[in-house]
């Protein structure tokens, strides 16, 4: 199965590494599992966040909001698991960090082989605009496989 076939099956244009398109589609077919949730908790724990930590929609430590962007990127969803992140979810978490007076800086931690083209550029523009208007410093830590 090639990259074009995957985009046809997904019914959406993709911005994804061709070598990972098939794996992405297979991951999206699976239901979220307890293992996926546990992995999400493991990612949060890297930043010192545990389930008993104060409720924020992002990892938070020392005045910095850490927003993980993991797995396949999807339009029109707020999902945030180790294997999929929704563009709407990214926007919501950045908006929350911008509005949170405890947050002095924002880090987007990106580890993704890409995802849907639809929504990608709109998400980037919205995130850029919100952070710029907030005046809060930000940066993105990008894995070598940040495709979209």
Provide a role label for each language-model segment:
Residues 1-148:
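N-terminal organellar transit peptides
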């Amino acid at each position: 199965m090639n990259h074009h076939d995957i985009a046809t099956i997904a019914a959406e244009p993709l911005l994804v590494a061709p070598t990972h398109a098939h794996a992405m589609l297979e991951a999206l077919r699976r239901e979220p599992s307890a293992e996926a949730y546990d992995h999400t908790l493991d990612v949060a724990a890297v930043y010192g966040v545990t389930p008993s930590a104060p409720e924020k929609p992002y990892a938070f430590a020392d005045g910095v909001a850490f927003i993980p962007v993991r797995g396949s990127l999807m339009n029109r969803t707020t999902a945030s698991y180790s294997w999929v992140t929704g563009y709407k979810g990214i926007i919501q978490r950045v908006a929350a960090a911008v509005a949170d007076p405890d947050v002095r800086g924002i880090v987007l931690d990106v580890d993704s082989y890409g995802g849907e083209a639809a929504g990608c550029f709109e998400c980037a523009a919205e995130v850029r605009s919100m952070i710029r208007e907030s005046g809060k410093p930000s940066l993105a830590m990008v894995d070598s496989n940040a495709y979209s």
